[in-house]
Every structure is written in structure tokens, then in C-alpha cells.
Amino acid sequence: MTEYAWHKEIKGWGVATEISLGNRRADCQLRCGKRAEVQARPLPPDEVAGREAHADLWLLDCRAAHRSRRLMVWSDPQFGTLFRWERAWQGFAISKRPVFLNLELDLRTGHGTFLEVTGWTFDGYRATGTGQIHTAASLRSWMRYGLPLAGHQPVAL
């Protein structure tokens, strides 16, 4: 099976790929030393928990959900950036690591948008929550060069 183009692109933003950790591996390592899992499909809760034993954050491909309006993001003057994700990937309800949702990405130009989830709640197949928007360029610079994300607090381990 060939590697999915989105997966290959995103993990290439790190400083190293396919980081071996015992009998598991992380998709990429960031300049700051954190390890990221790059995921293009839903996972069951036990798989999410298992991968979190060796990964520090998640990058999820939510472009199709955003295009089809199953993942809606909007700005609220009182609460900031909010989102609702219909038919959300339920396995991630147990995630304890930071999550970034890829909303848009043009693989030819590198332009795109990510939502850093700052809090979420799952109710069946619906997830609602808060987040912070980042451009693909700023996320890539954070991953590869360690440049801080605008308004970003360091990801705790």
C-alpha cells in the first residue's frame, strides 16, 4: 500500500520521520523533541490510548469533514473559536494529548488551516469544543524550526 499523500506531506514537516520507540513508532518528531501522530482515519479508543503511550500530539486529517460541513468552525465574540463535528472520530474522545484538526490544505501550494483543539466534549458521534486557528505555514514552522505558534502556550508533556 502506498502512503497517503496528505500523511506523507504532514509528517515531512517534522525534523525526522518514523521514530522507533520500542515496538511502536511515532510518525514524526518536531524540532522541540515532541513526537506527533499523523492520522487520516478514525481509530478505536484502545488504539488511541496505545499510540498516546509514545506520541505527544495528534494531527488529524479533517479536510473532508470540513468540506462537507460536518465539521463547522466559527468565531463567537464571547467564547472565541468554536467548532461542532458531526460523525466525529469517537476513539479520540479518550485522547489526553493535544489535537490539531487539519481543516484545509492544498498539497501543491502548502496553504491551509488547522484548528488546535483547546477543549472538546463528545456526545455520541458529535464533538463540540473550542480551539485556536493556525495557518499551515505557522504550524509547519513550529514543527520544523521550533518557531512559536501565535498566541500559543507550550504543549505540556
Question: Model-predicted segments: where are they?
Answer:
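Short histidine-centered beta-strand/loop micro-motifs
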Residues: E18, E47, E116
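Acidic-basic catalytic patches of nuclease active cores, encompassing PD-(D/E)XK
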Residues: M1-N23, L30
